């Protein structure tokens, strides 16, 4: 966009300045050092020639003037006849006068001319010409106007980097503001260091097949042929790795060869056994004095019993006294109940058989209890003493 030009009646009118105002070069912040507004070249700070008083510059005129100014800057070496502010800063920053100082700010796209980048111009031949682009508002004179390519700007200067690799590095560095060092992001001349992309401490069964393009080109410790690891410091087992014949979690006695049992062991007498059987019910008496007794057969090798085999007869009333005595001797054991009494038809075969089964179940539970076997005195006598009497225990 072209700037408005101050008219003749405007205060501070100046025909040589598009901004108007002041002839004093020291008060003009956009003037070049060592020059005044009256002696300045016809180029203004906006990059366009001064417009005629009270009007606008045409598009074709500004385009021609812009091309002429671009050619003049290219022939002058940097930016024009007068020394630019960026060039003076470049001379002050180059303490060794070798033209190889580090980038500090605002590097332009012309990487081979000035790495300080005080006032470089952006050249893009593919883009259309933009005659309405304005200059930088901060005075670094970096113009975004796209112009035609020139052969002189592409020629290497006397202070350019000595090699094409250095020029490419400077061109890459120009894309970063404020001179950010990009050396850590640049590829090295050697092959990719380290292992390939799929070579890690992840178990190999979880990794996909490694493509041929990701193999390593260096002979480092983690080469492409190095075996994958399950964990750091723990390599994979050998291919001939075999499972041990025994499990480390098995019991010690199960590791030894099992001993074959003989016929005597299979059918012999157990170490501890106790068998109590109630059988052969008999009914005695006549009339009101009738009663039924039962035979108790005991087979055992437990030391608490004096006899290995015994056979005694007890009636139902004897069982009732025996249970009462057990409750008094062993308070810590719950004594099971006896089968209930029958008042009618108590001598029938069905009633007698049901009572026999109940009495046998009662004796098996009581005689098999470990506390009653070691702590009861009446149990062995009741099961094996043929002369047992309730009067001896009451």
UniProtKB/Swiss-Prot annotation:
It is found in: Cytoplasm; Golgi apparatus membrane; Prevacuolar compartment membrane. CDD domains: PX_Grd19 (cd07295). One of its GO terms (molecular function) is phosphatidylinositol-3-phosphate binding. One of its GO terms (cellular component) is retromer complex. It comes from the Eukaryota. GO terms for biological process: endocytic recycling; late endosome to Golgi transport; protein transport. It is a peripheral membrane protein. Residues 272-389 form the PX domain. Coiled coil: none annotated. Residues 31-82, 131-178 have a biased composition (Low complexity). Its main location: cytoplasm. This is Sorting nexin-3.
